């Protein structure tokens, strides 16, 4: 049985902490800061950090990797096509990696960065996805390195995962993403309800994650490029008709960048 908790870092990052409660072994995903993990380990000295999973090379995801590796000897698993500090296992599309007895499938999801990967497993009772900065709750990452032609299919691929899949993304951006989703689909009742729910959570300083793939299909405009109203809003933003899913996505992303 794997338990997953969030260790907050910086202003809005989450370092995901996976725990095998029977064996008292743990793993972390995207430790941009070693501090929160060190403090958790100090408070739980009987636990061993066995693995560090990395989705991409940005410093707010890898800044704590080398220190944690030096302190614990944990295995560092990260994308093969990016510079990851202390990486022991280079991962690419189709690879599998066993962590705490759970086998994760590696999915290449370029766009935010060119070598970005996600980790998916359907072994637990509830499938789980660590999506890094590719898929956010009600949103997606900026394209710092990739293109719409890369990122839209990557997101569509994640959207095709089982609807009950729990989505663990790396930032608490949900409320701002939902404000944009409301602008794109002002009559979508699922967006409105989610906005109200998340507003209550954040008012109490509570985490809005994990999401689910099913909820993202209903409320995330970047996964809804085939919806008539979403396309109409994208067309209005660009001032012309967007004839492909990629074009609609690109219009939405450029709109969100200035929203």
Curated annotation (Swiss-Prot):
Catalytic activity reported: an S-(2-hydroxyacyl)glutathione + H2O = a 2-hydroxy carboxylate + glutathione + H(+)
Keywords: Hydrolase, Metal-binding, Zinc
Binding-site positions, Zn(2+) 1: 56, 58, 112, 133
UniProt-listed Enzyme Commission number(s): 3.1.2.6
Cofactor stoichiometry and binding remark: Binds 2 Zn(2+) ions per subunit.
Domain of life: Bacteria
Classification via InterPro entries: Clx_II_MBL, Glyoxalase_II_hydrolase, HAGH_C, Hydroxyacylglutathione_Hdrlase, Metallo-B-lactamas, RibonucZ/Hydroxyglut_hydro
Family that this chain belongs to: Belongs to the metallo-beta-lactamase superfamily. Glyoxalase II family.
NCBIfam families: GSH_gloB
Assembly notes: Monomer.
Functional note: Thiolesterase that catalyzes the hydrolysis of S-D-lactoyl-glutathione to form glutathione and D-lactic acid.
Descriptive protein name: Hydroxyacylglutathione hydrolase
Native organism: Pseudomonas putida (strain ATCC 700007 / DSM 6899 / JCM 31910 / BCRC 17059 / LMG 24140 / F1)
